[in-house]
From Swiss-Prot:
PANTHER family: 12S RRNA N4-METHYLCYTIDINE METHYLTRANSFERASE (PTHR11265:SF0), S-ADENOSYL-METHYLTRANSFERASE MRAW (PTHR11265). It is an enzyme of class 2 (transferase). NCBIfam families: 16S rRNA (cytosine(1402)-N(4))-methyltransferase RsmH (TIGR00006). Gene3D superfamilies: Putative methyltransferase TM0872, insert domain, Vaccinia Virus protein VP39. The keyword Hydrolase does not apply. This is Ribosomal RNA small subunit methyltransferase H. InterPro entries: RsmH, SAM-dep_MeTrfase_MraW_recog, SAM-dependent_MTases_sf. One of its GO terms (molecular function) is rRNA (cytosine-N4-)-methyltransferase activity. Keywords: Cytoplasm, Methyltransferase, rRNA processing, S-adenosyl-L-methionine, Transferase. It comes from Neisseria meningitidis serogroup C (strain 053442). Its EC number is 2.1.1.199.
Length: 328
């Protein structure tokens, strides 16, 4: 077992998320965030021999686990890449419509707890933060070249950090003297420039979150995949998304709301709302959060929110049927 595999990972809202998919034995399902396979294995336990599960992940360590699972279970297909390539990947696998798709957003416990990955300020490690360590620019590389304004905007917009301007200014000043290439160096700069601290939260939390989200294009990928899933779901198919912070959850909530209701008609409209075709989605139950027992067993579950939508027979608006290349 590799170092990364030794880290304990507890799947959040495991039963609730898979129950929300209403898995059919012969269905085709997508786990857009395989991680260590908690949701995937439960989906597989409910699929019959004719069922199929396609799993996505950027993380090479997660992909190694997924490929091992695929070798022992021919119902599993593996995609090494971000879920924003949803339609392209399904096309490549010869898959048309699907019965359900699940996304467990954000960072996984093994990624946080593996100090070498550079996601956590709890370890002194190279400042990487990439979910796919074989592609793209690391956090240290970006910090070395980003303008003060770009640093400020990323930390403010993705971390909702009040002291973003002071932190950005300090980063630029420090990097002129020596590279900011470890998690400890960045955490120390942030701590020196956050004047008030939130109870129970390290001052570096928001800045690390912001840079991680930016480096991995997390919010862009969420916004890109949702319309693709809507286009690929069969009638009655389910979309289930677990979000861990307000920025992700807002994107999901607004998307589902937009496509589960009609836009208000002007007073002079010649048609009534009752005469319009039904919206392409409907909200399937209320948003769910972990119960007290789950939070006690896994404190990282505290902020999780599960939202579920179901595909109807309603037509999808033309602007949501863009070419896949426009989403990537």
């Amino acid at each position: 077992m590799s170092g990364a595999e030794s880290y304990r990972h507890i799947t959040v809202l495991l039963n609730e998320a898979v129950d929300a998919l209403a898995v059919r034995e012969d269905g085709v399902y997508v786990d857009g965030t395989f991680g260590r396979g908690g949701h995937s294995r439960l989906i597989l336990s409910r699929l019959g021999d004719a069922g199929r599960l396609i799993v996505f992940d950027k993380d090479p360590q997660a992909i190694a686990v997924a490929e091992e699972l695929a070798r022992s279970d021919k119902r599993v297909g593996v995609v090494h890449g971000g879920f924003a390539s949803f339609q392209t990947a399904l096309d490549g696998l010869g898959i048309g419509k699907v019965d359900g798709a699940l996304f467990d957003l954000g960072i996984s416990s093994p990624q946080i707890d593996d100090g070498s990955r550079g996601f956590s300020f709890r370890f002194d490690a190279p400042l990487d933060m990439r979910m796919d360590t074989m592609r793209g620019m690391s956090a240290a590389e970006w910090i070395a070249v980003a303008s003060e304004q770009d640093l400020h905007e990323v930390i403010k917009n993705y971390g909702e950090e009040r002291f973003s301007r002071q932190i950005a200014r300090a980063i630029v000043a420090q990097r002129a003297e020596s590279p900011i290439d470890t998690t400890r160096k960045l955490a120390q700069i942030v701590a020196q420039n956050v004047r008030t601290r939130e109870r129970g939260q390290d001052p570096a939390t928001r800045t690390f979150q912001a840079i991680r989200i930016f480096i991995n294009r997390e919010l862009e990928e969420v916004g890109a995949v949702l319309p693709q899933v809507m286009c690929r779901l069969k009638e009655g198919g389910r979309l289930a998304v677990i979000a861990f912070h307000s920025l992700e959850d807002r994107i999901v909530k607004q998307f589902v709301k937009k496509y589960s209701q009609h836009a208000p008609l002007p007073r002079w409209a010649a048609v009534r709302e009752a005469d319009l075709p039904e919206p392409p989605l409907k909200i399937a139950g209320r948003a769910l959060k972990p119960g007290e027992a789950e939070i006690a067993a896994n404190p990282r579950a505290r902020s999780a929110v599960l939202r579920v939508a179901e595909r109807t027979a309603g037509p999808i608006p033309e602007q949501s049927q863009r070419k896949t290349s426009e989403w990537q």
